[in-house]
Amino acid sequence: MPSVEVLRFEPLLEGVLQRRWKRFLSEVELAGGELVTAHCANTGPMTGVLHPGGRVRVRHDPSPKRKLAYTWEQAEMPGDGGWVGVNTALPNRLLRATIEAGLLEPWLGPIAGVRAEVTYGRERRSRIDLLLQPAPEADDQRPIYVEIKNTTWSAADLALFPDTVTERGQKHLEELMHVLPDARAVLIPCVSRSDVKRFAPGDSADPRYGELFRQAIDAGVEVVPCQFSFAADAVRFEGVLPVQRTESG
């Protein structure tokens, strides 16, 4: 599948990452030498993508409603790794645009409607990222529950999620299994880098997540890793990666 642009925006500003602190904050030196504090939406360890002294891109939004006028959006990887999307608020928007453009129809079937943040789960205390309504011509008319995970960690050509223990992520897998068989359950790792060729669970970071990942696949949860490439003014859908059941192969 040729790459397809799914999102375009005002060009981001380039700078050099000085440090990240208090999880939510990063300090960036812009091209003109100005030091700014940028919001960091990714509260995890950012394994493999946190490189002080490396080039980053930030979005400038001086709205008076915002505490910080800058948001850290992308990080350049050493060597030929390209750019990685680090803003965890972006994947849901990316996947919605990709689905509504019909780019995932070979995996999901034709879709008539998309709803976001719908309450579901065993105790009705969880929210699914996207709930899809199949189009009338779809062979399978069951609703489709979609859980999206931003994936930035890699080892060689393997994209990995998670990069730390995530009890929340474990719960999401259990909730996806719970909707079966009355609905379809789909896990979409949003692979926010273009230098990898496969996806696997990060067993070394969270062994329990890896166990649940394999249980979910065996129970009927579908895994559709969607790969994206990042430019200063756009994001492109690069296709769906094959799934590897374990980190070690």
Swiss-Prot record:
Tell me the first and last residues of the signal peptide: none
Under the heading Pfam families, the entry gives: SfsA, SfsA_N
Q: Which organism is it from?
A: Synechococcus sp. (strain RCC307)
Mark the transmembrane ranges.
none
Q: Report the sequence similarity comment from the record.
A: Belongs to the SfsA family.
Gene Ontology MF annotations: DNA binding
Q: What is this protein called?
A: Sugar fermentation stimulation protein homolog
What are the leading ranks of the lineage? Answer: Bacteria, Bacillati, Cyanobacteriota, Cyanophyceae, Synechococcales
Alphabetical list of Gene3D superfamilies matching this protein: 2.40.50.580, 3.40.1350.60
